[in-house]
Amino acid sequence: MTELLPLNTSPLPVKLRVEDYLLLDESGAFDAYRKTELIEGEVYFMNAQHRPHARLKSRLHILMAAALQKIDANLEAVVEGSVAMPPNNAPEPDIVITSEAEGDGLIPFASVRLIIEVSDSTLAFDLDEKLKAYASAGVPEYWVADVNAKVIHQMWAPEGEAYTERREITFGEPVDATSIEGLSVSTASL
């Protein structure tokens, strides 16, 4: 059966699907841009990471890995692993907590328990577009580590394009995950 498309009187953008994005990536279409990610069907070029961002991400990864090991949760903290969130998202968060770190291709969405973004110049984007994409997909918990304000925005209970629960934790205070029982991350060294 042929699907009839509505008559458009003006041009409309086309959102890329994850499979379109992967084909373009594999063909080398994004080689000149170093790193990209797909958010709501649009391809975004990712900025270079300066020392404050890189340092915070590195320390947070070490702390998260140690905290996961303590609770023996069969989960792993993966740095900069792209996540398949069909149909229109393939983000590359700073840290992904997943039960399927091994394997080929993108991290399967069903394995994701928590996503962490480290933000300096990207704070507005991470708390708006990325938050909507993660909540819409049903990411159980989302943290945004704000380099400049020295806080972690912790969000959980996704509903539609938002998280219904959130709190702000100052660096130095522990962060208790809501989606992973027993997981508490010390932020004293951040």
Predicted regions and their residues:
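Gly/Pro/Ser/Thr-rich low-complexity, intrinsically disordered segments predominantly at protein N-termini
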Residues: 1-190
